[in-house]
Amino acid sequence: MTDKESKIRLRAIEPEDLDLLYRIENDRKLWNVGTSNVPYSRYTLHDYVANASDDIYTDRQVRMIVETEEGETVGIVDLVNFDPSNNRAEVGLIILDAFRRHGYGSSTLEQIADYALNVLHLHQLFSFIDTRNEASLCLFRNRGYQESLVIKDW
């Protein structure tokens, strides 16, 4: 499968995704790409999955599983820090190691942008990316994101 052929779909998080969430949220290598730097318990994640309304207006966030057309999970994408007054949200994306550099990240950013624009009617998506994360910076630039601010000592 080439980068241009990487077809994915986004779906709601199911209880069966708990192990995946647990692995991602407790992977210390990923703590620098998000706002959390503490482990999450299975109980906390189970509670999140059970109680999330999947309504971005209620929760101010929405998380989706990224999977291939064949149903294989390749990652997770979310819109967080949703600001309905200013029609914007922050994008978070994790593609599992085994699926990186196959176009899944690019396809995911394309689909989440389409969802944000055409379903949620947002006019701005943004992301905080560590300046050392060259792969992610390149991915977002290639999808049309522009670097507008470098935050020092963040």
Locations of the language-model features?
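Generic alpha-helical scaffold signal
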Residues: P15, P39-R42, R60
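A short helix-loop-beta-strand connector motif used in the catalytic cores of GNAT acetyltransferases and
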Residues: A52-I65
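Conserved catalytic core of Hanks-type protein kinase domains
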Residues: R23-I24
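Alpha-helical elements of Rossmann-like donor-binding domains used by nucleotide-donor carbohydrate transfer enzymes
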Residues: L20, T44-D47, N51, S107, ...
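Generic structural signal for secondary-structure transition and capping sites
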Residues: L18, K29-L30, D54-Y57
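Conserved GNAT-fold acetyl-CoA-binding loop/helix
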Residues: K29-N51
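Short, intrinsically disordered/low-complexity patches at protein termini
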Residues: Y43-H46, D54-Y57, D97-A98, L125
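Acyl-donor (CoA/ACP) binding surface of acyl/acetyltransferases
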Residues: M1-L18, D27, T68-W154
